[in-house]
């Protein structure tokens, strides 16, 4: 469940900032297949990937994080 929420948020911010999966994966230094797994919620992103994604998207990791209930 948590992986799905992270994946949806990463995908939404990626699209909002105009990145393709290929371009975003390259900027993160990961494969497109790993990014796809994360975005589909099949893989929980590591703390390093979360921070790298936030840096590439020019947002804070807190903004990228799912809201707490």
UniProtKB/Swiss-Prot annotation:
<dbReference type="GO" id="GO:0003677">
    <property type="term" value="F:DNA binding"/>
</dbReference>
<keyword id="KW-0804">Transcription</keyword>
<dbReference type="InterPro" id="IPR010982">
    <property type="entry name" value="Lambda_DNA-bd_dom_sf"/>
</dbReference>
<dbReference type="GO" id="GO:0003700">
    <property type="term" value="F:DNA-binding transcription factor activity"/>
</dbReference>
<dbReference type="InterPro" id="IPR050807">
    <property type="entry name" value="Bact_TransReg_Diox"/>
</dbReference>
<feature type="DNA-binding region" description="H-T-H motif">
    <location>
        <begin position="21"/>
        <end position="40"/>
    </location>
</feature>
<dbReference type="Pfam" id="PF01381">
    <property type="entry name" value="HTH_3"/>
</dbReference>
<protein>
    <recommendedName>
        <fullName>Uncharacterized HTH-type transcriptional regulator YazB</fullName>
    </recommendedName>
</protein>
<dbReference type="InterPro" id="IPR001387">
    <property type="entry name" value="Cro/C1-type_HTH"/>
</dbReference>
<dbReference type="GO" id="GO:0006355">
    <property type="term" value="P:regulation of DNA-templated transcription"/>
</dbReference>
<keyword id="KW-0238">DNA-binding</keyword>
<feature type="domain" description="HTH cro/C1-type">
    <location>
        <begin position="10"/>
        <end position="64"/>
    </location>
</feature>
<keyword id="KW-0805">Transcription regulation</keyword>
